[in-house]
Amino acid sequence: MTSAELHTTAIRINTHQYDDLHKFKQYRLFPNASVQYNFIKGVNFAVNYNKKISLPSISLLNPNNNTYGNGNFGISGNANLQPTIFDNIEAKISAFDYVFLGYNLSLVNNQIIQKMIRRGDEVSVINENISSVKIHNFNIGFPIPFMIFTKSIKEIMGSMSTINPDKVSFLYFFANYQLQRLSEIKPNGLWFLNLNAQIVLPKGIKLNANYSYIPAKVGYFYFQTDEPLNNTLDITLSRKFMSDRLNVSLYVNDVFNTNKMSSRSVYQTPNVLIRDKSDTRTFGISVNYKIPTRNKLAKENPNMLGSDKKEDEGGLIK
């Protein structure tokens, strides 16, 4: 399966710092090619190549947009940022949309990254393009259905293609390891770990628990974490009513109030240390109602794996 896209992009930026309009124009072909081999029904190996463009956000471009500032610290935009071009190569083996093992290589031109600069007692965060970056991603995901305690492996494998994950109790494990290679520095690899549990209780009640964790001493471009990052446990109790059209949920986000940021900038020596902690524990109730439709093709996708990969803009500080 192959496809190609032709994009033309023109952006004009007008600020009080420039007498003339600063503009850039891109006219490129963005191909997309995929090859898939099916071993058996539901099990396949796929290779994909695609070229993408990512435009800098307005907040990054606008030099007047000071997201935060005081006498000692400030963040501002950069009107000279250029669009980022990604050449992505991915290989992945997957089974029944739930189990997968994958590798992705991104060759990036004009990656937007954050640099923290210290001049005396004044610290500023700037956004710049760097000419080239290689980003390696290794990821794995698999479920552990609780039915393994009551059914044989043969029975479970035979029902994988027809199983509805909304009706099954399971523990899902996901891990991603990212390695960034820049010309100036070689950051430590970045681990992202996630556990998601779903337990189907009596009376149609579901308990969902989601735990995510990024360990300390991992690298993210010109930053290194000193303490675990994104360390959160979220719990949700939900039940559907009215033929599944009405969904009522009670939730607690960051149950132990452990989410915080503690990192250092390695762009300059001595390093600038950053630490931020606020009360991130939240409680709430959510009520959702799905309006009935006569479109017989409209239905929820039971696939628990996200398929869209978003390109980030290289910064810990937003």
Identify the residue ranges that each predicted region occupies.
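Conserved C-terminal beta-signal and adjacent last beta-strands/turns
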Residues: 187-318
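Residues on the lipid-exposed face of transmembrane beta-strands in outer-membrane beta-barrel proteins
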Residues: 6, 33-37, 89-95, 103, ...
